[in-house]
């Protein structure tokens, strides 16, 4: 309960209740829950078997879960052994969006620094806890969605199949990316048909990789095979776009300190902030198998050994920017909460009532009431969710109230 960065968890009737409006899908609760009570929902493999042609889009993090001497093409071959017809990486989209980001920032005049929209958990955090910073979030879509859009628009003609016969599946490193596909907030629906976590596929993928590696040589790699580590690690985005005045930060506690600084008009000398919820970036995702530090080392070595530089025509980037191809469909807006009201007078009354109740409390954040802090309890009272006597200290005093 106390680990949740947005205080979205309450204990009611001996059960953990998660507030959907406050949850940012960071997955912290999944990793710290001692009984494993919180479980993410992914798609069973059998549910996607009806597609005539199945395309898998792996997160670049997947490659880092294996030793650096495992060629990325071996991972592709292993995925095909699992029944996928084609594997498409996000490297091309990452490179294109990196170039598009630079062009967007040059044209975008005004408040700084701008903030990346790459991490869905960070986007939700800003919408919930830092609504004044929403205007600073770069409204460019993410590499996985742009990749899936390319597949959806080009593969039907290429394969001679109907769009609905082609299944596009993502392999995700974290809960936030799963939710962003199953319940996208900034678009009507995701371009993906399904999503697996890295944990879902790792145990069945590893034996295939071990078997394929025996006797495999780099001569077996097709000449047209391309590998790009993309934005898997912290700093990957800023490395791709080759910026000067940037800041890369990871981990929710660290990110919130930076967002506090931005909200207080600090960091004005910074043009861009790459903010990621998981420590060290996506390689620290809750659904990964390997230690993030080992995975980071693997990713760096793989990048040095196998990565190809991707060339994209400048005219293509300009055309896609002007046509809105790279942008998120819907505007990024603050997420409304039931604590505040659209009516200013009502909101002020609620804030005053919250302060009045908070002053009555012991302010020791014991958590016995089922709220993570005394301030959270006061907010719950204002919302009409608890009674004052739910606080054990006020109950001992015989305090009356709602």
Where on the chain are the PLM-derived regions?
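Iron-sulfur-associated redox domains of electron-transfer enzymes in respiratory
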Residues: 39-367, 372-402
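Helix-enriched interaction subdomains in cytosolic or periplasmic regions
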Residues: 1-34, 126-131, 136-140, 402
